Amino acid sequence: MAVNKGLTLLDGDLPEQENVLQRVLQLPVVSGTCECFQKTYTSTKEAHPLVASVCNAYEKGVQSASSLAAWSMEPVVRRLSTQFTAANELACRGLDHLEEKIPALQYPPEKIASELKDTISTRLRSARNSISVPIASTSDKVLGAALAGCELAWGVARDTAEFAANTRAGRLASGGADLALGSIEKVVEYLLPPDKEESAPAPGHQQAQKSPKAKPSLLSRVGALTNTLSRYTVQTMARALEQGHTVAMWIPGVVPLSSLAQWGASVAMQAVSRRRSEVRVPWLHSLAAAQEEDHEDQTDTEGEDTEEEEELETEENKFSEVAALPGPRGLLGGVAHTLQKTLQTTISAVTWAPAAVLGMAGRVLHLTPAPAVSSTKGRAMSLSDALKGVTDNVVDTVVHYVPLPRLSLMEPESEFRDIDNPPAEVERREAERRASGAPSAGPEPAPRLAQPRRSLRSAQSPGAPPGPGLEDEVATPAAPRPGFPAVPREKPKRRVSDSFFRPSVMEPILGRTHYSQLRKKS
């Protein structure tokens, strides 16, 4: 019976025992993870038929391998059934203990994530409150204390000022200050002339003046008095500068210099402005029509010159009228206006520079139209003529008042040409005298040469030695001069000054290049 009973127990009548693998798979965390993995695998498998066929092949392979492994491991499992049972019981007890210690294993992943999020947010909120609340409370306390202190100090100061003003000494001090300020205002009104704006008020303000006004405070009265004094000071300085300018204009020589400076400044400004308006890279447009308008531009430039002169005269008249009138802006306003004009001219010159460079490039490449070239050339010639006139006047004045030696041009090496190359007649006579061997009865006179040419030198100083020119002719020998032996003429040492100039009448001072040109022409 015992054997039969054991056989029946082995056949399956044993009570069912818990399996560790089943319990682990039944845990909400593991089951949820498995479901998520299964959904991902299914969606990936359904994405493409090729992927589905590959996955099915792998599934069949895994199933066949698992069935083969179970069939091969079955004898081993039967022999080690007791050991597997003991290990299963031990694992179940450990799983029970783990579930007691970690209750989160009994909840799904969504719930665990939400609870974890709430826990983290509450912890962060509590940490932030623990830091910010003390700081906010402390700052509120500090600001409240500072505000209370300021209000207390302001109240104390106001009460003190009111108390001091209500005392006898305060009343006396305020009355004295009021009296002194009133006396100063009366003195200023008596000494200083009233302004036109204040003396002639608008009719709309007359009714407002009739209405009673509150007495201005001491500070406002002091400010008005200071404003009046400063305005009068500026006006006085402007009048003094104007009178000094008028007195300086009476000095001889100042008026021409000032007018010349004003004219130069106006010409320069007009040249810059006209150049800015004209230079717009004109050589990029209308290249063929430029040559046909040359004659018209010449006439136009003459008309423009007359118009420019008229504009200059009108501008000078306006400038003189403005200078004669008292400046309403005063000294500071004039300085500011001058600085503004200077800044504007600087900016205009800077902006005009690129266009000027492009125009210059066009002129170099012969692409600039004739109108622009002719007008620019005309203005440049007018400016050069004006400068030349000024220099001529200065030179004439210096020559008139300063004694200078009169200078004229002298032909270089003209005096010593006959020494190096004597005439043929002189050589013949010298040869006959030497052949005869007889001493000369008297000194043989040197051949008298003709006067030098008069094309470049009108007269010659009596002390200078005569020198033959290009057109000189050999004259007949003169009467013998007793007492002068016939000595061959020696070539004196040449000086640098002899090759360039000789004192004579007032003639232009020229160099070697100019002299060579004049010599070729003669």
UniProtKB/Swiss-Prot annotation:
Subcellular location: Endoplasmic reticulum; Lipid droplet
Phosphothreonine sites (modified residues): T85, T299, T301
A molecular function GO annotation: lipid binding
One Gene Ontology term from the biological process aspect of the record: lipid metabolic process
Composition bias type Basic and acidic residues, residue spans: 414-435
Compositionally biased spans, kind Acidic residues: 291-314
Keywords, comma-separated and alphabetical: Endoplasmic reticulum, Lipid droplet, Lipid metabolism, Phosphoprotein
Main location: endoplasmic reticulum
InterPro entries assigned: Perilipin (IPR004279), PLIN1 (IPR042998)
Modified residues (Phosphoserine): S81, S126, S130, S132, S137, S174, S382, S384, S408, S436, S497, S499
Record bears the keyword Endoplasmic reticulum: yes
Cysteine disulfide links: none
Chain coiled-coil ranges: none
Tissues showing expression: Detected in adipocytes from white adipose tissue (at protein level). Detected in visceral adipose tissue and mammary gland.
Protein modification: Major cAMP-dependent protein kinase-substrate in adipocytes, also dephosphorylated by PP1. When phosphorylated, may be maximally sensitive to HSL and when unphosphorylated, may play a role in the inhibition of lipolysis, by acting as a barrier in lipid droplet.
Location of region: Required for interaction with CIDEC: 291-319
Family: Belongs to the perilipin family.
Illness the protein is tied to: Lipodystrophy, familial partial, 4: A form of lipodystrophy characterized by loss of subcutaneous adipose tissue primarily affecting the lower limbs, insulin-resistant diabetes mellitus, hypertriglyceridemia, and hypertension.
Subunit structure: Interacts with ABHD5. Interacts with CIDEC. Interacts with AQP7.
Name of this protein: Perilipin-1
Organism: Homo sapiens
